[in-house]
Amino acid sequence: MPTALTDCALTCLHADEALLVLLKPAGLLSVPGRGADKQDCASARASQQWPGALVVHRLDMATSGLLLMARTPAVQRALSQAFADRQVEKRYQAIVQGCVAAPESQGGWGDIELPIAAD
């Protein structure tokens, strides 16, 4: 188990001439933040291995998951437009600790089919 975020590497699940699919660990920014202490991020790490890699979307710092990066400006535009047009299906899963409520049929868990926040 990593002892510090600097020990957490991006895992590349797919790379070709058009795009990268990276597994971003929780605790790592997708893009640089404000301040010198917030420059370590997935996009900077990806650019070290794949110069010119371009951000398509972001994941919250506390979220681990798949991050798409484009290898060309044309691919970045196309993928960004697909996200904007909601053509990309996203799924989120949570790992919880403690007791989970009964199934939806019994008044417990189910699917949420709403945006996380208003656009």
Predicted regions and their residues:
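RNA pseudouridine synthases
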Residues: 1-119
